[in-house]
C-alpha cells in the first residue's frame, strides 16, 4: 500500500530555515499575520528629532520584511513596507543614505528608488561631504539621474 522512495530527500525535516531578517521584521510579520496590516511609523516631530541611527533602526526591519515578502510571495507586505519607508523618508532624510546602502544590499530596488527620491535634492551636499562613498556605482548612478530629474523639474517651475 505504501511505497518507499529511497532517492527522495524530504526537506521538511530541516532543522532551520535561514532568512536574512531580524527580530524587528519578524515581529512586524507576526502582527501582519494577525491583523492584516503592518505597524506604521508615525512621521511626526518625534520621528524628525530622532538621530539617523535611531531612524535607521526603525527602517531596517521594513527592508528585511520586503525582502522576505519577495522570497515567500507574501502579497501586500512588500507594498506596505514601501509605503511606510517612503512616508518616513519624505519627512526626514537623516537615515536615507545608510538606508539606501542597506536596501541595495538586500536587492530591494523599489525601496532604494524611494530613498533616492527623498535625498536627490541633497546630492551635491552629500557628494561634497563624502557621505556617498559607501554606495556602489549603480546606486550612485541612480542618485545622479534622480538629481538631474529634480534639477530639470525645479528649473521649469516658477
What residue spans do the PLM features occupy?
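Alpha-helical protein-protein interaction/assembly modules
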Residues: 44-63, 75-158
